[in-house]
């Protein structure tokens, strides 16, 4: 049912100062520190435990009646 739901995963690689040979990128070099950095974006199925999913569901349900950008009133109301 939900097996096809995917989310973007962003990975940032910073190899500045690393002596390993970079063979993945074959395009033109920029000649500066950007040659040693990379951003990878992929789509994958998120893996979340049932316990974490239930906590988030309860959190979302608890706030569903709150309007956007309206602060919640905390504590008890004083009676004068």
UniProtKB/Swiss-Prot annotation:
Functional summary from the UniProt entry: Light-harvesting photosynthetic tetrapyrrole chromophore-protein from the phycobiliprotein complex.
Specify the species.
Answer: Chroomonas sp
Q: Which GO terms describe its cellular component?
A: chloroplast thylakoid membrane; phycobilisome
Miscellaneous note, as given in the UniProt record, is: The light-harvesting system in Cryptophytes contains phycobiliprotein complexes. Unusually they are composed of either phycoerythrin (CPE) or phycocyanin (CPC) but never allophycocyanin (APC), with only one type of biliprotein being present in any one species. Unlike cyanobacteria or red algae these proteins are not arranged into higher-order phycobilisome complexes, and they are found in the thylakoid lumen.
**Residues that bind (2R,3E)-phycocyanobilin:** 16
Per the record, the similarity remark reads: Belongs to the phycoerythrin family.
| Cellular compartments annotated | Plastid, Chloroplast thylakoid membrane
GO term, biological process aspect, one: photosynthesis
What protein am I looking at? Answer: Phycocyanin-645 alpha-1 chain
* UniProtKB keywords: Bile pigment, Chloroplast, Chromophore, Electron transport, Membrane, Photosynthesis, Plastid, Thylakoid, Transport
- Which Pfam families has this protein been placed in? Phycoerythr_ab
- Answer whether the UniProt record assigns the keyword Thylakoid to this protein: yes
